[in-house]
Amino acid sequence: MSSAVPRSGFVVFCVLLVVTLALYPVLRTLGVQIYSAFTGKYVSGYHSLLLVNCPTEQTARDIGRIIMEKRLAACVNIFPRTATMYYWKGEIRDATEILLLVRTKTSLVQRLMTYITAIHPYDIPEIITFPINDGSQHYLKWIAEAVTDS
């Protein structure tokens, strides 16, 4: 009988741990929003920038439009004709690429990178992310409203 009590306590502990870990992203997002609402301060890293190089302007426009339609990004800038040098298969190569600058919530970065990798024509697409440390509160709020976590 005494061994049943500790065992059930352990099961309850494990269930609580699993539920807490499963809900962590939601709880963190909620905590950040509450903190920001009460203090009026931005929480560093809640939003991110992604840099994505594309081989053509049409590819960049297609990727940009698709991620916007899926509401994975709030805004995409397309910078035409960036000169690029890189190592590929033991050689230094020169190319002209189109740079996408994407703004989103950090909670969507992994999903966005997975999606871009799946539709990008490169074998190894260049996708680099940076957390946004600060910025216009109104703009950052707009980013959060423009994208969806679902």
UniProtKB/Swiss-Prot annotation:
What broad taxonomic lineage does this protein's source fall under?
Eukaryota, Metazoa, Chordata, Craniata, Vertebrata
What keyword terms does UniProt attach to this protein?
Signal
GO MF, one term, reads: copper ion binding
Family named by the database record: Belongs to the CutA family.
The organism of origin for this protein: Danio rerio
Give each disulfide bond as a residue pair: none
Which InterPro entries does the protein's record reference?
A: Ion_tolerance_CutA, N-reg_PII-like_a/b, N-reg_PII/ATP_PRibTrfase_C
Q: What is this protein called?
A: Protein CutA homolog
Q: Where is the signal peptide?
A: 1-31
Q: Kindly list the biological process annotations in GO that this record carries.
A: response to metal ion
Q: How does it assemble?
A: Homotrimer.
Q: Which Pfam families match?
A: CutA1 (PF03091)
